[in-house]
Amino acid sequence: MRSEPRGEQEVSEGGVSGAPLSSLFTRHSSLAIHGYASLWGVADLNGDVVARGAFAASLAKTGAGSVRMLHQHEGRAVIGVWDRMIEDERGLFVAGRIMDWSAEGRFAQALSRAGALDGLSIGFRSSRARREGRLRVLVEVELWEVSLVTFPMLPGARFGVV
């Protein structure tokens, strides 16, 4: 008599314990959002000003899909994906989807639908900057993430549900 290790299930062509493999994968629902993660020439509450074109090199190198969508800048809380990031005449326009694949994602979806979460904030490394009085002008940045936040450092950086 063969004994199975505890907690493990037999896998066959029919799936796990006879269930079809397709039942192991579920479709996730998403909530489409868009807005401005950064605005050209506007000082944030920390005295940073992003110059027009500051994200161009980073986005050309990585694309929007490599920039993470986080909740409140928490690296462990990836809550969705960014589908588009475009530098336009106003700033960095972003469009993406908050996914329901985690508790944080579902929470962010609910808050966004209710209008309680609508801020955006960028996580980056400055590649080139200059000082203008008390302000730091970011000329080129390496964009790592755009977070959905309660209180953005740039008060005008907001998103809405599509």
What is the predicted function of each stretch?
Residues G7, G18-P20, G35, V78-V81, ...:
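Glycine-centered structural positions embedded in regular secondary structure
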Residues S3, G7-S12, A43, G47, ...:
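Intrinsic disorder/low-complexity signal
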Residues M1-T62:
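Polar/acidic, low-complexity leader/linker segments enriched in S/T/G and N/D
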Residues L59-V94:
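A glycine-rich, hydrophobic loop/mini-helix early in the fold
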Residues V42, E74-R76, M99-S102:
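Short, charged/polar surface micro-motifs in flexible loops or helix N-caps
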Residues R2, A32-H34, R84-V162:
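Residue microenvironments linked to proteolytic maturation
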